[in-house]
Structure formats: structure tokens, C-alpha cells
């Protein structure tokens, strides 16, 4: 089972969504008559304004696998509350053996994140963020852990509603 790590490819479609292909793996299924080759693609899609989604597609040909992954990513999009091009607060995300730490950063810092995490932030439209991964560096697990962390983001309005206070009281 040879593994092909594809270069992250960016594409912007007519619907205004940014697409990035994170990886393409060649997979084999061994059967009585020999081997059957296939491909698995991992992609992320975002609108550059806080919406992001991840998709995984499998097929006998690379373009078909990528197409399936992009369609699935579009269906799985969700909104992340951003604050001035960065995150609301520091947060941890976990999936499988991958753990990620995501922290907001000051203007001018840029996206300090490795591989698959960088692709997620690029399609989301985050300009300043610091991210660190621990554990497994499997691209699928890293993307899922990053999305887990992003789902845990809460706005000051959310926290105020939970505590039964006003936003001004929360922000001090």
C-alpha cells in the first residue's frame, strides 16, 4: 500500500468557496485475482468568512475521489465565530491520537500552523492564529481535531447567555 501525500492545492470556484485538497492516498484491496487499486482524497472547503467543512472521497480514479470529497465538504460546512480575523479564545481539539492547541494571535502574526491545519485556516479566512499539534500527524486526524477545536469556540454572547448576564458584564 503506497501512500501518496499530495501537495495542498487551492481552487476558487464560481460560488465563492475556497477549496483545498489536503491529501490523496493510493489504497489497495487484495482479492483472489490480484490487487484492486483505488484512491482516497481529503479536502477542506471554506468561504473565507468563517465557514468551513471537511470531506473525504474514495474512488477508482483521483479526480472522481477529489470531486466526491469536495461535495461532501460543501455539505458538512459550519460557521465558526471569528474576531478580527482570528479566533475568539484559546481552545483544544482532539480526534483519535491527534490533539491540537489553537490560540488567537495579534495582527501581523500570520498563520502559524503546520500542514493540514494551515489549509483549514486558509479556506476559513483566518489571518492570525497560532496552532500546535501533538500526537498523531495523520492528516485526517489533524483536520478532524482542528475542526473539533473550532466547534468549541464560543462568543461573548454565548457565555453571557449561559451565565444569565449581559455581554458588557462578561467583557468587564
UniProtKB/Swiss-Prot annotation:
Name this polypeptide is given: Small ribosomal subunit protein uS5
Domains as described in the record: The N-terminal domain interacts with the head of the 30S subunit; the C-terminal domain interacts with the body and contacts protein S4. The interaction surface between S4 and S5 is involved in control of translational fidelity.
Assembly description: Part of the 30S ribosomal subunit. Contacts proteins S4 and S8.
SUPFAM superfamilies on file: dsRNA-binding domain-like (SSF54768), Ribosomal protein S5 domain 2-like (SSF54211)
Stored InterPro entries: Ribosomal_Su5_D2-typ_SF, Ribosomal_uS5, Ribosomal_uS5_bac-type, Ribosomal_uS5_C, Ribosomal_uS5_N, Ribosomal_uS5_N_CS, Ribsml_uS5_D2-typ_fold_subgr
Molecular-function GO terms, alphabetical: rRNA binding; structural constituent of ribosome
Superkingdom of the source species: Bacteria
Family designation: Belongs to the universal ribosomal protein uS5 family.
GO biological process: translation
Gene3D superfamilies named among the record's database cross-references: 3.30.160.20, 3.30.230.10
